[in-house]
């Protein structure tokens, strides 16, 4: 493998835990703990992203090197790597949880590529760290496949996200109780190499504020601005104000994209919120099949549904408020923080309107259009309509003669389709009238809509089918699914099977409809 150029500013410029090794402990006055990955028995490459490899300056010959699986399976380090686990806290399901930290993620270092980019490499499932608590620091193949595939699928959908370089099987078993019901099972282990410019989270700042460590809080703020937001200029006070405003704006844009494509994160705790506004920590996520703002894929959240699909914009705002509370001791006033929170609301409204307009083939969404949108969403929920298939079919409607039959494949329940048929026909006529005001020809309208409405999304049942095969040693379906998701807006006629609505067998199956945090 060609050597990588490392410039590990996080470990160079921020204080380290004076203790080393993976034994569990409370870590104060430090941003990270030095810890090495724990070697595994038989690392082997399951899948990789050629696009992410290219970001690092590598090609297929580097990936094919026997050294690759050894490095990204945690068995050896490259020159320049300085492994560590980060220290942070967070609010989990609305409650302060204290110190959390990287319990099974180990950052290897920060790579500089030839285009001026900085990419942090992080192994997830690489063994115990000081933050593992009572866990083993490992990850199962099941959850690792889901994280690897969704990281790349989201990127190709145009959603801000962390990336994934590789998925490496460990040759070892990991014991997990998938639904916390007292039935633990031994499952194949795996390690994902996650890649992002930064893995700093809201929780990094929250823990320092909760502990009253104002000195390190100020250092972390200044470090984050200097390394991760180099375009922000001005006085120290102005930089901080613009930085928080930027964090709020990026978070708003990220969540608006989630809502556009039907993604439900599942566990929007503040320790799972990226300071860069990237989707991070793909655990019990899900994709909306039949449109339902109240749906959550996370069994842990099944009662309160705090992180349900339609609640995500509000939760992101709440999480930013917790970040603002943590930053207040360093900012000294609420003015800049409130301005940032106001920016979140403004940017989310603007981006959400623009994306909804694009999904409907409109140039812009006026206030007068909102009742039409609300009526559509209400009907979609009542009629149990597949979100992805519906919007893709909507691009094919003949505005002069709209035909409801075009949408037959999008319905999950024929009785509900018939019950709501008149309501939908009325909406479709209203929509056609509105579209005719745009003055676009059919091809222009279709192109606008198909650029906003994916044909292919990482449906849970598709991921589960790939997992089932991989657990039997067949990695072909994982690689095929990754390849389909590289072009989610293209028709890909030879891959139409990946664009089908959720089959009946997957409606209640574990891993296809509901998931847990067990991974």
UniProtKB/Swiss-Prot annotation:
Nucleotidyltransferase involved in the post-translational modification of proteins. It can catalyze the addition of adenosine monophosphate (AMP) or uridine monophosphate (UMP) to a protein, resulting in modifications known as AMPylation and UMPylation. ATP binds at residues 101, 103-104, 124, 136-137, 194, 201, 281. The active site is at residue 271. This is Protein nucleotidyltransferase YdiU. The keyword GTP-binding does not apply. Belongs to the SELO family. It catalyses: L-seryl-[protein] + ATP = 3-O-(5'-adenylyl)-L-seryl-[protein] + diphosphate; L-threonyl-[protein] + ATP = 3-O-(5'-adenylyl)-L-threonyl-[protein] + diphosphate; L-tyrosyl-[protein] + ATP = O-(5'-adenylyl)-L-tyrosyl-[protein] + diphosphate; L-histidyl-[protein] + UTP = N(tele)-(5'-uridylyl)-L-histidyl-[protein] + diphosphate. The keyword Metal-binding applies. NCBIfam families: PRK00029.1. GO terms for molecular function: AMPylase activity; ATP binding; magnesium ion binding. HAMAP family: YdiU_SelO (MF_00692). Its EC number is 2.7.7.-, 2.7.7.108. It holds the Pfam family SelO. Keywords: ATP-binding, Magnesium, Manganese, Metal-binding, Nucleotide-binding, Nucleotidyltransferase, Transferase. Its cofactor is Mg(2+); Mn(2+). The gene is ydiU. Mg(2+) binds at residues 272, 281.
